[in-house]
Amino acid sequence: MSVESDLKKDGIEVIKKLDTLRVNSIARTVSNSLCETFPDFNLNQNDLFIKLSRLDMYIAKMPEGMAEANYFYKNTSIYFNDHIADEDLEEFAIHECIHYIQEIKDKRNYLLRMGLCDYTEFRIYGLGLNEAAVQLMASKVLAIPKEYVKYFNITFETTSPSYYPLECCLVSQLAYLIGEDVLFESTINSNDTFKNKFIELTNAKTFMNIEDNIDKILMSEEEIIKINNKIATMDDNSKKIDVMNKKIENLKSHITSTFIKTQKLITSIYFDNVFDSITDLEGVEKYRQKLYNFKDYLGSTAGDTFFNDYYVNKMMALEEKYNYLENTSVENVVDDSMYLTKKKTSKLLDFFNFIKSLFVHSDFENSVDIVKKWSFSRLMYQNFYNLQCLNSGNLLSLFF
């Protein structure tokens, strides 16, 4: 299919081509910004400027719901929505210029790979993962502050409130666990470092499931946009509209359930695996901090207590592991399961069981978000500690 046919199919109508001076200005700004933001990614500012200045850039009319800018690899061109102010073109060019830097083509100009996305003969893998990673990079370049948003009944904090927000939320979780620099380096240089690191800490099946689920979320969002655009052209009295609205609601429910399922998968697989690898007290503290801070990257829905329950269970298990490691030298560890030997239940363990029962059995009229719940838990622990004069002051910092 020709470029013209592709553009027509997507509803893109070219208005004008940007002149060389404007393209060079955008290329200079973007190349400078990328090199300043990511100094360790082997980006040469002069080489990058020359590369980006070879792009063709156009102003075009675009259908409702389409991204404000789009990169087309077939003719190495960027198309900007005509309602973008000229002084804002650089901002929207960053995401698309990263796509251009990412692309790997064969001798016949067929796209093989773009960052974290693989293009095979029959299917594209990792499109949602790559789009989210690129958007997170663009947000970092632009220094966009975090803000709370709510989409499809999911509330979360993000630096990308308008573009791929749900996908960015999930990929931010991966970046936190594996390392933001690892994610971004693999994204812009189109390599498997991030993928391999994640698989090393989890497994290949989990990576593929996460990758596939993020793609499903992206495709469902795109389908909703297409249906809404079609509804906009129909008579308000058309019976088909009811059917189409029902389909939209089903897609929204699918997006929500897929997001929550993926988030639970990321949480449980990663932290379960890392927990099993803890061999010293320093590892216990690092694990505690990482799991606690992970709450800041999560999306939440009304009535969902998964992370609360998971955190309490892991803190109880972590105390057992702490006690075992404190009393057993690493050299004497024969079987990791030894620390599970039945011990006398501590007051701290009793406390966490009590907190867990509150989360599991209480019937709140209004859902309390994760942060408030854990602030409450911390206060409860401190009060419990002060009242009971627990002989475990060293564990206060361990758990909070």
What are these regions (language model features)?
Residues T155-N327, D336, T341:
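Pan-zinc metallopeptidase signature
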Residues C117-Y163:
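Post-HExxH zinc-binding segment in Zn-dependent metallohydrolases
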Residues E91-K107, Q135:
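Active-site recognition of the HExxH zinc-binding catalytic motif
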Residues D10-S77, D82-E87, K107:
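Auxiliary, metal-adjacent structural segments of Zn-dependent hydrolase domains
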Residues M1-S2, V134, L348-S362, V368-F400:
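Non-Sec secretion/translocation targeting segments of pathogen effectors
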Residues C97, I255-Y270, V274, F352, ...:
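Extended low-polarity, hydrophobic cluster-rich segments
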Residues L111-C117:
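Extended compositionally biased segments used for macromolecular assembly or nucleic-acid engagement
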